[in-house]
Structure formats: C-alpha cells, structure tokens
C-alpha cells in the first residue's frame, strides 16, 4: 500500500502526468500503459462518480502510472468514499486558505489526526481488512494536493504552505487566469508571472508544486523552475484534435468551436 507517487514527490523526482476526462475504465487502462508517471481522474469537470472512479482505479492498478483523483469539492463525505475505494492521492479543488487546506488534510486521516470514518471492512482500500494494520498505516500513505485557483488563494499561499499534511500545491491556470480578468488566456504575462512566482514559493517551502499545461515550452519552463508534478495533456483534447486532424487530411472539416485553454 506504499504511495509511490508521494514518495517520488518527497524525493524531488519530477512526475509527468495526463488528465483523464473520458470517465472510462477502458481508456484509462489504455493510457495507463502509455508511460506517464501519473493519471488524474477528474471528478470536478468530468462526469465521474465514486463508481466510475473505482473502475478506473482498478483499470490503472496493474500499471506503473499512479492515479490521482480530483473530487468535485473539498467535501469530507465524498473524500471518505473516494479513499475507501482505494484513492491514496487527492487533488482538492478551489482551496482558498489555510483553514480549507487543513480541512482537506483532516478528511484523509483517521482519528485522532482527522475525521475519516472507519469502514475498512467494506473498503477496497484495506482489501476488506486483508491488509494487516491498515488503520495504523493508512494516514502516512495519504498524499494531499491542494489546488489554488484565485487571487485570494495566491494571497494566502504562505499560510497554506504552513499546513501540516499538505504534500503539494497545484496551480489551476484556467481558473486563475479567469479570476485575474484574463479568461481563456493563461499565457497572459501577468498570469504567467503569478504562476512562476508561486512555483518557486511552493518549492522553497518544501512542498511539491504542480500544474496542468499542454504547451510543451511552458511545461518545460515550469519544470526548470521546480514544478514536480506536471500534467502535459488531456485525454479528451488528444482524442478530439487527433480525430479532427485525421478527418482534415481527407477533406472534412470539424464543427467550428472556440479553442479551449488546454
């Protein structure tokens, strides 16, 4: 039950990831063999629930890629359910301050360190109580990544970084750029300056900085600055653009849509 993703971050080894939004265990397994260090199962913006997260965790399990799960909100009940089906690494969205970061950490810990309910007899995480001393070992293997996506969160970053149990801080470029008045343009110089400053600040505090960016040049820049978990693409985008390119080679034209951030 060792969390190798958490161990890699602690050791300072950069981890390259891919975002999963297709909500499919079949495509999750396909991508688990592609060579990425981690795969993000998105419960915030993709149509996932606990059951679909479970099947994707099962599909990814035989492969080296490590799953990271994003719940729809910083909700202790939802987090409890995700942990029970086997999630060890969480990316908690829209964390605004230290209190909210502390709540996220407490939701992943059994008492007295936290508030996670004990249901190990029903839980895949404990292999239905077949893992010896699961209740004693589980807390140490939880990896909590909090997501900062607003100017308010950026202002509170020093206090968030002081929260014990926060392993990493993920910068959400799409929401941050929108909050800064540059919706759809995370490459705006002011947004980029804020992102770069945050990456350096997070790393200097001994935490792991993370981000999602499909621009290869920017991804490499963030890695140079010290980012440790960087998602470099999204499965839905890869599929859509590849399909459009194939159709275009035979004279077809995709339905006109406004380009997205990723």
Curated annotation (Swiss-Prot):
One of its GO terms (molecular function) is 4-hydroxy-2-ketopimelate aldolase activity. The keyword Transcription does not apply. GO terms for cellular component: cytoplasm. It comes from the Bacteria. It holds the Pfam family HpcH_HpaI. Its cofactor is a divalent metal cation. One of its GO terms (biological process) is 4-hydroxyphenylacetate catabolic process. The record marks 84 as: Increases basicity of active site His. The active site is at 45 (proton acceptor). Pathway: Aromatic compound metabolism; 4-hydroxyphenylacetate degradation; pyruvate and succinate semialdehyde from 4-hydroxyphenylacetate: step 7/7. Substrate binds at residues 147, 174-175. Keywords: Aromatic hydrocarbons catabolism, Lyase, Metal-binding. Binds 1 divalent metal cation per subunit. A divalent metal cation binds at residues 149, 175. Its EC number is 4.1.2.52. It is an enzyme of class 4 (lyase). It catalyses: 4-hydroxy-2-oxoheptanedioate = succinate semialdehyde + pyruvate. The record marks 70 as: Transition state stabilizer. InterPro entries: Aldolase/citrate-lyase_domain, HKHD_aldolase_ent, HpaI, HpcH-HpaI_aldolase, Pyrv/PenolPyrv_kinase-like_dom, Pyrv_kinase-like_dom_sf. Homohexamer; trimer of dimers. Belongs to the HpcH/HpaI aldolase family. Catalyzes the reversible retro-aldol cleavage of 4-hydroxy-2-ketoheptane-1,7-dioate (HKHD) to pyruvate and succinic semialdehyde. NCBIfam families: HpaI (TIGR02311). This is 4-hydroxy-2-oxo-heptane-1,7-dioate aldolase. It comes from Escherichia coli O9:H4 (strain HS).
